Amino acid sequence: MDPRFNTAVEYDITLTPEDIDGVIPEDLCGVIFRNGPADFRLAEHEFDGDGMIRRLNIAVDGSVAFLSRYAETAKRRIEADSPTPKVRGFGTQIPGGPLHNMSAARERGNAANTSVMRHGDCILTLWEAGKPYQLNPSDLSTIGPYDFEGQLDAKIPSSAHPKFDPTTNELFNCGIDYGKTTQIVTFRLDRTGKLTTVARTPVAHAPFVHDFALTSKWCVYLVGPADISLRPFLTGLKSVNDSIKWHPERGTQIVLVSRD
């Protein structure tokens, strides 16, 4: 790992107005959550650092509270006292060669380190290839994996970049189902909390689809010419990162999926 990526420590700090130089404007108040990789002890790629959630709370009385906690994922528990990686990540292989990595090919090294969102009274921390983890908003303690009350297909990972439409109170997200035919799975969460699969859209090859855009009518996917070569990954020879190949001759495909 690049030595510039230092492992972060957890903080719980509260400042009163007397502790602050100057005065915070009265209309600047509220809570903001942030997430990102922060523990790089075992990571061979910055995307594999364990996720740390940070909460900054500016109260109406001018006090400021900052809290940061690691998401206590299965990955973090497994690797807590280990000197070497125990779970494959985006760019991290476990020791022991291809056979060890092949046996772990389907384990999801969910680091819960990419983004954070609010869903009702829940705070969810997201990762690109697995279920969200639910956190307690008061102390950021980890409750566990969250599947929207059993509605999220365990076989289809959800993206870490959902899109919310404030005019309809609907949340859209996607996952990639890599199989004999690769499919983009688009799903919608309505204002009542019901999750519906909107479409399963076949695409060529095994594209690396990271994000999408949302309009009033469409979910818009830019499917670029970057593919994941599944064979070297599934046989334990390479990580996901090292299995991504660029095929510029294919160009970029724009896939439109109706929200309805």
Task: Report the location of each language-model feature.
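Short, conserved, GDST-rich strand-edge loop motifs in beta-rich repeat architectures
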Residues: P37-L42, G224-W246
